[in-house]
């Protein structure tokens, strides 16, 4: 792996205030590499977890994120694919070790599909989160995706019924959770939806997904996971997919035997000293945004919090302390392990079926 990731649980309750001064987006470099595209500013918000969306706390933390939009020649309206990054940040769009991110653009444009590279980090003063996942939360990225969807839906050259989204790892979570009504309905008009999503290798065990998912039926999801992935385990995603399907969602879970995390990276499988929490309790969100009892009771038992109420108050008023307390609890309970595998150089092998998915669902 070209980076060291820290598993997603650390970012679930992070404070939007942790972000520093906005950085110049690597999308400007990507724009030069690709030789096309228009830089776009998207008004958005930051939050801690779903409870911040559910209770409207996110409105107190506005922010403007950037994206790179490229449309095929002509008047349109065109379908558009939103491409999101992992914990490595938007620099990976231009990285030598992840050519897949750029190689998809030309064939997509040739098919008549526009591209929209979304930067969740730079506006929040963050380069990447693999060194400290507490700096940008997953749920902030979900907000960005829906704000970007709203922008694209109002663009005169975009077909608002043919917008897709994709990404891997953290970007895989971003691409999976846009199928959730509870998030969509709290943020944008209920008539808006992504036509299709292609998440890869999301974290489904400790990412505060919903105990009771309420999927948007119009969104078709094709989730691809490596069967050998020891970083973000495929099993919890298979089980989550069953819940989504049982509740009316259009989802296919595709587990590839022998594939590891970051399987589209153009490098051989290698060991990474990443922290993993597979022996800690899973974390799920209830409909009201609260975490499940098992996870919270575990944190209260081993951490500095006296009760659920104490923990949730910290999430709102001092998220940094909440995160530190949670991590301290996991460390004290000795449920944290270290060491995963990444890579595999399957990008070129995967590309034809990946492009076919977009041809079938956005054209």
What residue ranges belong to the model's regions?
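Short glycine-enriched nucleophile-adjacent loop
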Residues: 153, 172-187
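Short substrate-entry loop that stabilizes the transition state in hydrolases
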Residues: 75-78, 83-127, 206-207, 230-234
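C-terminal catalytic histidine-bearing segment of alpha/beta-hydrolase fold enzymes
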Residues: 250-363
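Active-site loop->helix "elbow" adjoining a glycine-rich segment at hydrolase catalytic centers
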Residues: 87, 169-172
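N-terminal cap/lid segment of alpha/beta-hydrolase-fold proteins
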Residues: 21-76
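Alpha/beta-hydrolase active-site loop
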Residues: 133-156, 177
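The feature captures the conserved acid-bearing segment of alpha/beta-hydrolase catalytic domains
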Residues: 189-258
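Alpha/beta-hydrolase fold nucleophile elbow
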Residues: 158-169
